[in-house]
Amino acid sequence: MTDTKELNYAIIGGGVLGMTTALRLAQKGHRVTLFEASPQLGGLADAWTLGDVTWDRHYHVTLLSDSYTRKILKELNLDDDMEWVETRTGFFTDGRLHSMSSSLEFLRFKPLSLLSKFRLGLTIFAGSKIKNWRKLEGMLVGDWLQKWSGKKTFEKIWKPLLRSKLGDNYKKTSAAFIWATIARLYAARRTGLKKEMFGYLPGGYGRMLEQFEKHLTDAGVDIRLNQSIESVSHKEGRVFIKSSNEQSEAFDQTVLTVPSRVVPKLLPQLAKEEAAKHTAIEYQGIVCVSMLLKKSLADFYVTNITDGNVPFTGVIEMSALVDKSEFDGKALIYLPYYVPEGHAAFDWTDDEILEQSLLGLESMYPDFSRDDLVAFRASRVRSVMAISTLNYSQHLPPSQTSVPGVHVVNSAQIVNGTLNVNETIKLAESAIPELLRVACESSAPQTPREVQHV
């Protein structure tokens, strides 16, 4: 038990953020119910089956310096199973593949002049030395990068890289985004590691999530899968949650981990100004193609694409990181299409996505044949990450909502990092003290109350 009263918590959303929040609250002695609309936990980190292979639905990697992810892995007795690998990085520029995996290869990179290379390196170094990231929130990322790198390097390198993650939304994104990206790359040095390495768990994130779910159950968390939430409301000191099965349950405290655009729909009692702030947050979406191939495309884990005629925004060859035995000896690649949440790409059929993807691969890899394709699937997610627009952190709605007993903890609150599993877990961990403080100060009952079914 803790110094707070035992309360009944509802966590809405069973991604890694919701799972971590549920675990920590349960470990503090509270009763926790975790609601998830899909048939499995994990959210963006969940697994699916591609042909005869089960692996992550979206591409993920763990860095040696990802301390929050590794803390969870240690709790699940999985950290010692991690495999750590040095990977190579490629650039597809001017119709050719180039390796950019070492300082020497960077110096030999012909598409950039020696001066441009110097300015590019200086930009990254300058970004790594910035301590107060908030100063960058008032400047567009394109303006900041052109100031340091010059227009030519921006057009040749930075702009395609920005578009690979942000699409046309890069035009409204603040320079804090690139600071966070550079900070993640320099995390290893800041934590005293000699070099950064990429890691994977044999069995993928699906294995971690399976163990995580068991850990939650052992901690006493009540997991409700296939339960969409229709509404959340406050009445007479309790928070009532109505699910898709028309059942209404009362809790002492509720935490929403859903995207901000969903919050006002679930919470009609939210103050108008607060609801408007949630609605104003723009999200970047993704159509993420998974392909199982008979053979590898190249030996690069990530290939950044700077040619505008390729439809997808990068090539991630997971089998350049993960031992091919995990994929029955085949190659697993991801082709991301990062697009705004209202983009027409979400209406493309699987056949249309497949054809575009195959044409793109044929334009990049002369040895690629359509006969190499073993299996194909496409994941579509409209709200992946919030766009860090100008002065983004100043416009965020508070975590503690205007509705008593209801909190929002979602990835839109990641203001000084990039969206990844480590930052998601970090967000959950940092939210717990505030959740407990509010619970302690609330007018919760002196003795535990059973969940009320209405």
Language-model features: where?
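Short FAD-binding loop at a beta-strand-to-alpha-helix junction that anchors the flavin cofactor
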Residues: I333-Y334, P398-G417, E423-L427
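Conserved Rossmann-like nucleotide-cofactor binding loop
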Residues: L17, Q40, R261
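Active-site/ligand-binding neighborhood in enzyme catalytic cores
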Residues: L112, L122-K235, A250
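N-terminal Rossmann-like FAD-binding beta1-loop-alpha1 element of flavoenzymes
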Residues: L7-L34
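Mid-domain catalytic core of redox enzymes
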Residues: Q227-D347, D351-F368, S379, S393-S402, ...
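Internal hydrophobic alpha-helix adjacent to the cofactor/substrate pocket in enzyme cavities
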Residues: T424-S443
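Dinucleotide-binding Rossmann-like beta1-alpha1 core, especially the glycine-rich loop
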Residues: G51-W133, P160
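Glycine-rich FAD pyrophosphate-binding loop
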Residues: A26-L50
